[in-house]
Amino acid sequence: MANAEIGVIGGSGFYSFLEDVSEVQVDTPYGPPSDSLFLGELAGRQVAFLPRHGRSHKVPPHKINYRANLWALRSMGVRQVLGPCAVGGLRAEYGPGTLLVPDQLVDRTKSRTQTFFDGEPLPDGTVPNVVHTTFADPYCPVGRSVALAAARGRGWEPVDGGTMVVVEGPRFSTRAESQWHAAMGWSVVGMTGHPEAVLARELGLCYTSMALVTDLDAGAETGEGVSHTEVLRVFGENVGRLREVLFDAVADLPATESRDCLCTHAHDGWDLGIELP
């Protein structure tokens, strides 16, 4: 089976920028991922792309099989993941078209399975141990630096750091919820950043979020109610720039064998009880 070293999880239009694309269906112990993986070459690197919501956006945020998605990527050889996503801005200065590379995350989801290490037997009879993963810094520091440099190189000055609060969805926040998020000092709000980030960490993957602001959330000073139509419009206007940044980030990520960041040491000293792919 073909392998990749870098994974991109994003909207279904992104795989169109890969060269020599092949579509691969992957089975996992956690069921099927959101869709097939699209393997190809980008910037001289072997990349696996996975449409987070499936083709045609058929899977809502709270129904995404995040465990299967990350497991499938790792089973294909992926060790570094870029996760572009659409978010709402919680500050007036983070208007539509802002690119923010967060360094912190707050989980406000309710029903999502967020660990591989729950002590529940897998289909092959193996049983993962209960593991408490270090997650103080949820994003790869190396990947963040690469993403920031890639954006600046394309003339798109990104916001360096900030907190993404992740809500359950699929509805948008009420005004009261959004005002509370803003009052807490959080930067942007999204629906898919968790448990994607922590599951990547549990698998020893370097994960970098690249958050494109598509609207001012209702709790921002000048924010109105969010509409899905407006989110799609703004994302469509900026997807070309985001592809360019992704291209450069993929080119500049370190070689897999040279990784030595906190992500690679997440389970030092732990007996996982299962073998990772």
Residue ranges and their predicted role:
Residues 1-135:
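Metabolite-binding pocket within alpha/beta catalytic cores that recognizes anionic/polar moieties
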Residues 74-77, 182, 201:
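Non-catalytic positions within long, well-ordered alpha-helices that form the structural scaffold/packing
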Residues 191-229:
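Zn-dependent metallopeptidase/amidohydrolase metal-coordination segment
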Residues 137-182:
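Active-site rim beta-loop-alpha module in soluble metabolic enzymes
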Residues 79-80, 187, 206:
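Short acidic/polar active-site loop segments enriched in Thr and Asp
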Residues 267-277:
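Acidic, Ser/Thr-rich low-complexity intrinsically disordered segments
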Residues 218-268:
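His/Asp/Glu-rich mid-to-C-terminal helical/loop segments that flank catalytic regions of hydrolases
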